[in-house]
Amino acid sequence: MEKYHGLEKIGEGTYGVVYKAQNSDGESFALKKIRLEKEDEGIPSTVSIREISILKELRHSNIVKLYDVIHAKKRLILVFEHLDQDLKKLIDVCDGGLESVTAKSFLLQLLNGIAYCHEHRVLHRDLKPQNLLINREGELKIADFGLARAFGIPARRYTHEVVTLWYRAPDILMGSKKYSTPIDIWSVGCIFAEMVNGRPLFPGVSETDQLMRIFKILGTPNSQNWPDVFKLPKYDPNFPVYEPLPWETFIKGLDDTGIDLLSKMLKLDPNQRITAKQAIEHPYFKETN
């Protein structure tokens, strides 16, 4: 820690306190101080250490770079590149949603970063606008990649704030333990819709409410649109039956190709969701440099 000074607290995230600091050359970094779950004799979880070492190997222009891991007494300190703004703040100040060209650029960058990590068998598991950082050049970078795998998604955040359910896939909400790449794609779809609409698509207040909000818009799953849904632990055959709404009734300012892409991301059945690599090749991006 001696090489960093001028610590300024800039936030409290899912896993700990985040500080802005400088090194001796005046370069800015984001330091995440993470409390570790202890194993025997107070030794940090070997799983945590192993997972974080994998993150250090990830190198992509759309992923926040992890420069260093400092092993302190009861915590790990992760040293990341520092960016000033996150996507949530940007959406909040842009009343009515982002401009279409901006939303398209951010979505493509997000998919590029996601595709890279999925190719390297790393999942995010906790994608949301707060985890997407943006610099002054309009570059989007994904933060906290892999931390959910390393430390688990806690029921409550470090700040005692309930972890948001708004971007969580219906298969996970119904108890699926098969964490794979489609859970990140669902989150990307929710973020895409939020960039376009200027507000969250499924702002649930509990797991049950979250599912009902999804079903009221996309329809209740059945044997036709999701053959394996009955196998999920929290599936209830007595779920209220809703028919899917027309996309144009709840998505504003998106053309037909954009709606087609979004609909492929927000498939109820995870096996039917588009992959990040496939999404990058979608016609929606054909006019994007």
UniProtKB/Swiss-Prot annotation:
GO terms for biological process: cell division. Its EC number is 2.7.11.22, 2.7.11.23. The modification Phosphotyrosine is found at residue 15. SMART domains: S_TKc. Pfam families: Pkinase. Serine/threonine-protein kinase. Involved in the control of the cell cycle. Required for entry into S-phase and mitosis. Probable component of the kinase complex that phosphorylates the repetitive C-terminus of RNA polymerase II. Belongs to the protein kinase superfamily. CMGC Ser/Thr protein kinase family. CDC2/CDKX subfamily. This is Cyclin-dependent kinase 2 homolog. It comes from Plasmodium yoelii yoelii.
